[in-house]
């Protein structure tokens, strides 16, 4: 402030976690075994094992998530993976390079088509047809992304998966195609249109008639329902997973008929926005929250809002 930029050392302690869009400001330290929730900030002072949510931050109760499996003996699938598991993850992570490679191929194909049209038809007709070419490439990008999603993970289901498991890696692989292929070639040009609804439906999102969607951040698509005439604003995240104690927990998110999740808000797993209700911009709908029918809630975390 005041024309000055502040810098400082920031520390995140051992086995601590800062959620998506969480902030640990300059000069602050998050003690070990602690958690800062999505869209939340780290307080000035923290104790080991403390958990925080909201902005300004408040203490939060937390239940430890464990994987009760012989394969996770000695935390082999969470904190202490063996060499074979690391190698397997490395193979899948390397496959994420396929996404930018395919996107580059689409760019090369687009330029090749433009060159052919220019040579055969001249500039005026090429200019008139250029939009159709881009629409065709967008359709190809979307089709490939849908195919990769169904090959990698099939249908998403509510469940818990340790960090060092094939499902988590393959889920990240298909999400890379969403971000690197489908987003620049399709989603980012179709916000608020019927086409984005078609693309999200193909990935598994249940979308009602007349829904207006201005975001493609629907991570585990099959776990999301957007009702008829509902609104999902720009920059919103319908987040169907949480990573806690290095376990990926998946659950449903429901946005009922006529309801609104306003701009730059986040809805966490197991949450529900009731019929004809509104969650204001920049809000955090916590895990398991239920916004009642015909209500207006806002805040981080959300609370009833009197207009």
Annotated model-derived regions:
Residues 49-204, 289-307:
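Terminal amphipathic alpha-helical/low-complexity segments used for targeting or macromolecular assembly
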């Amino acid at each position: 402030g005041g024309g000055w930029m502040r810098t400082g050392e920031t520390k995140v302690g051992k086995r601590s976690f800062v959620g998506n869009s969480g902030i640990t400001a300059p000069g602050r330290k998050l003690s070990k075994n602690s958690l800062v929730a999505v869209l939340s900030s780290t307080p000035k002072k923290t104790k080991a094992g403390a958990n925080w949510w909201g902005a300004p931050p408040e203490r939060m109760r937390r239940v430890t998530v464990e994987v009760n499996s012989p394969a996770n003996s000695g935390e082999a699938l969470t904190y202490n993976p063996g060499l074979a598991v690391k190698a397997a993850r490395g193979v899948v992570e390397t496959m994420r390079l396929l996404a930018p490679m395919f996107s580059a191929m689409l760019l090369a194909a687009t330029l090749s088509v433009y060159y052919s049209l220019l040579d055969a038809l001249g500039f005026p007709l090429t200019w008139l047809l250029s939009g159709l070419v881009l629409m065709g490439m967008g359709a190809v990008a979307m089709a490939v992304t849908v195919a990769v999603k169904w090959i990698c993970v099939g249908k998403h289901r509510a469940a818990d998966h340790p960090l060092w498991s094939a499902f988590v890696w393959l889920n990240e692989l298909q999400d890379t195609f969403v971000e690197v292929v489908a987003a620049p070639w399709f989603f980012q040009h179709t916000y608020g249109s019927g086409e984005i609804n078609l693309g999200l439906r193909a990935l598994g999102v249940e979308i009602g008639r007349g829904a207006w969607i201005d975001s493609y951040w629907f991570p585990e698509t099959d776990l999301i329902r957007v009702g008829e005439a509902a609104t999902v604003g720009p920059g919103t995240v319908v987040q169907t997973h949480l990573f806690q104690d290095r376990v990926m927990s998946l659950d449903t998110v429901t946005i009922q008929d006529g309801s609104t999740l306003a701009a730059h808000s986040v809805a966490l797993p197991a949450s529900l926005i009731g019929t004809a209700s509104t969650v204001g911009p920049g809000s955090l709908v916590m895990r398991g929250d239920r916004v009642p029918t015909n209500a207006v809630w806002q805040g981080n975390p959300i609370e009833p809002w009197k207009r």
